[in-house]
Amino acid sequence: MNATPEKADDLIVVGKIFSVHGVRGEVKVYSFTDPIENLLDYPRWTLRHEGKVKQVELVSGRGSQKGLVVKLKGLEDRDEARLLSGYEICIARSLLPNLAADEYYWYQLVGLKVINQDEHLFGKVDHLLETGANDVMVVKPCAGSLDDRERLLPYTAQCVLAIDLEAGVMRVEWDADF
């Protein structure tokens, strides 16, 4: 394991180590990629947790009932592996595939101001949730918000009218009373 991290502002969180597996240093990983196995396409990860940063290399990985089971280079026993529980798995932003003009990664949406068709500022996108039907944006109030309510808005074509990453704004069709 190498201690030289990527630049912090260039890193995207793509998973999290949540436990150990067996006695040979394997770890259980929750992948934020879709499908979850896509995380295994990235051979080098930057791990972050409570100010600590480590570079690691992927040796192997496989699917399991609750995510992935992964073997990292230099991690040989259960006790070493346990120390990585809770670490976020990050990759360099430049490694992500390019998307079509009307597609966005979740990290690009977080922090956008959300304004409805009546020019009411609802707040900023705090995070997104994956549900069975569609993704849901959690919009939390910010300075200048219409009110102090947290809103859950569907990330659908019917709700999201326009996204301007440069301006930091998302326009939505959503009644202020919902």
From Swiss-Prot:
Asked whether the keyword rRNA processing is assigned, the reply is yes
* Residue ranges occupied by any PRC barrel domain in the UniProt entry: 101-178
Q: Which terms are listed as keywords in the entry?
A: Chaperone, Cytoplasm, Ribosome biogenesis, rRNA processing
This entry carries the following GO cellular component terms, namely: cytoplasm; ribosome
Does rRNA processing count among this protein's keywords?
yes
- What are this entry's molecular-function GO terms? ribosome binding
Provide one Gene Ontology biological process annotation. ribosomal small subunit biogenesis
User: What role does this protein play?
Assistant: An accessory protein needed during the final step in the assembly of 30S ribosomal subunit, possibly for assembly of the head region. Essential for efficient processing of 16S rRNA. May be needed both before and after RbfA during the maturation of 16S rRNA. It has affinity for free ribosomal 30S subunits but not for 70S ribosomes.
Summarize the subunit comment: Binds ribosomal protein uS19.
**PANTHER family under this entry?**
RIBOSOME MATURATION FACTOR RIMM
Question: Domain annotation text?
Answer: The PRC barrel domain binds ribosomal protein uS19.
Family statement drawn from the similarity comment of this UniProt entry = Belongs to the RimM family.
Name of this chain's protein: Ribosome maturation factor RimM
Q: Which gene encodes it?
A: rimM
